[in-house]
Amino acid sequence: HPTLRRQRQMCIRDRFFQEIIIFGFLLFILFTSNPFANIFPIPSEGTGLNPILQDPALAIHPPILYLGYVGTSIIFSSALGAIISGSINKSWASHIKRWVLISWVFLSIGILLGSIWAYYELGWGGFWFWDPVENVSLMPWLCLTALLHTVFTLEKRGTFQSWAIILSITTFSLSMSGTFLVRSGILNSIHTFANDPSRGVFILSLIHISEPTRQIR
């Protein structure tokens, strides 16, 4: 069936670009965060988890937030496939909208849980403190919200093709940029619990995968 064939072709293209992203992060783990690397000198006792992070909400807030970030990589991969194949149309919008919605839901829940935790954590300024790291998580959410409306419009009316692609790529780029800013130590934030400039530079190099945005006019 032609529709099933198109869906299969889109999935193959999406998977190709997604595998490139996964390979990049595997290199990141291997060269900067190897879990099997020896520690020398051997510490006599670990420092333990920061007391601020010893909260049940922190068992679900970061994973849910990062599930939203991971979803933006799938959207990004699909956008690249649509650019190369020239299939930025209603079928592509129908194909990608569920990933946009899933990512938006996870990112929304993650931000909400973080806000609730910040409310009862002493000295965090209420539900929203406009901390740099909080703002970093808000930017992809705003782009995802705009993309959600754009994709539904593209599916129904066949318009806003360029906006759908631009927002798809920008959302992923903002997620990567936010990760770089947090891990590199550039931002001075109350969220800064672990940073390493060398790891931040590696993440920054992965952001250049977004170069296809220059081809969009």
PLM feature spans:
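Membrane-interface interhelical loops and short amphipathic "cap" helices
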Residues: Q9, N34-P62, I88, L113-V136, ...
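Helical transmembrane-bundle signal
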Residues: E19-I29, T72-A82, W104-G114, L144-L147, ...
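Juxtamembrane interface elements at the cytosolic ends of transmembrane helices
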Residues: F36-A37, I42-P43, L67-G86, L144-H149, ...
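Alpha-helical transmembrane segments
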Residues: Y66-V70, E134, L138, L167, ...
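Conserved active-site neighborhood of enzyme catalytic/cofactor-binding cores
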Residues: L112-W117, G125-F127, P132-S173, S177
